[in-house]
Design a protein with these regions (language model features):
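Long, acidic, intrinsically disordered low-complexity segments
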Residues: 75-83, 87
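Short glycine-rich anion-binding loops that position phosphate/pyrophosphate groups of nucleotides
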Residues: 12, 82-84, 155
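Short, flexible loop/turn elements at secondary-structure junctions
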Residues: 10, 121-124, 153-155
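Conserved catalytic cysteine-centered active-site region
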Residues: 33-51, 84-147
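Short beta-strand segments
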Residues: 80, 146-155
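Conserved "HGTGT" condensation-loop signature of ketosynthase/thiolase-family condensing enzymes
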Residues: 1-78, 96-104
């Protein structure tokens, strides 16, 4: 079995922030518990044009660019989320569509043709399951296959 692991992590945070003092006041929550107990001072919130898919696509693009990955060699993009956009279609398909638009001039249309995309939706465990599943998939490829999988955690 091939040695597998996490090669890199890319993070995308929205640019808008909500002050936790304001949040606590608005929600009638104890700011001390949020600030001292959880260490929170602000919370990132998506802009009007941002959602789970755009944030996931931004993080994926950073990862692909930084590691000079060929999208044609990426075999899967698995998304762990609590915030699905569509009741029937996986949000990961929207991420893949945005990535195809970004890379089609360089790698050709449908450069993610052989990429499997799935959402795993179950609170925080969905992302952990996506990671374990992808690590197992890479390991099962053996040393002769150079499998590349991307796991996205987005909410």
């Amino acid at each position: 079995m091939a040695g597998v692991g996490i090669d890199d992590i890319a993070i995308y945070f929205p640019k808008l922030y909500f002050d936790m003092k304001d949040f606590a006041e608005f929600r009638g929550a104890d700011f001390g518990k949020l600030n001292k107990g959880l260490g929170l001072t602000a919370m990132a919130i998506p802009d009007a044009h941002e959602d789970t898919a755009t944030m996931g696509a931004n993080a994926c693009a950073r990862l692909i660019d930084r590691n000079q990955l060929d999208p044609r060699k990426i075999g899967r993009i698995y998304l762990g989320t609590e915030s699905a956009l569509d009741g029937a279609k996986p949000t990961a398909t929207y991420i893949m569509d945005m990535l195809e638009q970004r890379y089609d001039d360089t790698y050709g249309k449908e450069c993610f043709r052989n990429c499997d995309v799935v959402d795993l939706t179950f609170a925080c465990i969905g992302a952990v399951d996506a990671m374990h599943n992808t690590l197992d998939w890479v390991a099962r490829g053996g040393d002769e296959q150079d499998r590349i999988g991307i796991v996205v955690f987005a909410d």
